[in-house]
Amino acid sequence: MLRSLPASLALVAAFASKASAHAAFWDKSMYGFNVTAQTFPYDNRPQVPLYNMTFDQWWFHGHKDYPPNEGDFFELPAGGEVNSIISCDKGATPFYESSPGGDSGYGSNSPCPGQPMSEYHTTGIDDVKGCCMAIAYKPDVNDVQPDDFVVFSCNSTCVWEMNTKFEIPKLPACPEGGCHCAWFWIHSYDSGAEQIYMNGFKCKVTGDVGTQPLGKPAVPRRCGADPDHGKPDPTPGNCTIGAKTPMYWYQREGNNMFEDTYDAPYYNPLYGFNDGAQNDIFMDGVIASLASSGTGSSPTSTVDSSSSAAAASTSYPAQPTSSTQDAPGSSAYPSSSSDSVNSPTTQPYPASSASSTSEAQTTPAAVPTSVATEASSSPIASTTVDEAVVSSSTVGSINPTRSCKPRPSGVAAQKKKRKHARHLHNAH
């Protein structure tokens, strides 16, 4: 029996390693702070990846009914910086005492102490793709919609260390009751399956707060140098400048990004997110080439499709359409309407001309009715929406698991794998 003990311990250690993979933002201000693997019918701990889920399952990680204690806020010092805790395991953070397994490595600055880099989806520091924080100026979590969030800070070397700094722009004060924030991460395509990470938390702006309201956010666009896809030079005219939304990708419904399996969107310069505070968030988001030409001064400007390659939607700049993607996702946020419209897809590879921002044919992006019609008192700059385009998603419930989604097979997928030299032997 004693001989079998080391083998048993090895098995337990291996299981523990697998169970604590992936990463999450950890703070007492977060939703789902005390959620365990047994809270839901499926493993829905904060560090579990999100993919192919219904809107209610991925939005705030499905943790809206597990709020922080009254008065717990993550403080954002206006014009300063803040330290955040990002880890694969709550037990490896300063909050280990409330972890079901207790202390599992606290004291290390690794996001996953004692585990290989594949557990936090990277092959090395050159393979990290960045993460971000976004803010919504609404105190009631049930009022927060996807387009309310504005990305205000990015860290381009994330996930790499447990202690991760975020620079804070001169944000205006939150309303009474505070703001809502969220941490977002999409890892490298060559270090795991296609998925996103989102953890919501209560936050408030402190210190010498600003007075300028945030602009109306627009969807980010692929515009940076992309040598892996034969684009050695950036296409700045294709960037979204100004306030930008987070990137909602690879879900069953609620996507605003439609890149395919091997073209993941990232919170780095490839999508117009520079490292540090996003100090352009005080202007409305708009496609750079349209702004420079004066064609569109704000994302609600209507562009004549007969004279421009880009047509604007009724709320944000239209994204170019492309062929059907492998990623599952409906084109709009859930609504009660029985009507539906086609949603645009983002262009993984911008046109060769810097002045061209999309394909000739575009379709308007659907937005939630509440976003298009709500009169908000938040410091997000108001814009006029000519018409609310509403879509419905009537997708049935699914049964997600914490395991990463298997990759597509077939000749095309295998060619893509070989082309990009994927490192799949330790992927999750």
Swiss-Prot record:
Q: Which cysteines are joined by disulfide bonds?
A: C88-C112, C131-C158, C174-C179, C181-C203, C223-C239
Its GO CC terms? extracellular region
Bias (Basic and acidic residues) occurs at: 223-232
Q: Where is the composition biased (Polar residues)?
A: 380-402
Cofactor info, note text: Binds 1 copper ion per subunit.
Record-listed E.C. numbers:
1.14.99.-
Location of region: Disordered: 216-239, 292-428
Report the glycosylation sites.
N34, N52, N155, N238
Give the molecular function GO annotations: metal ion binding; monooxygenase activity
Please state what the protein is called. Answer: AA14 family lytic polysaccharide monooxygenase A
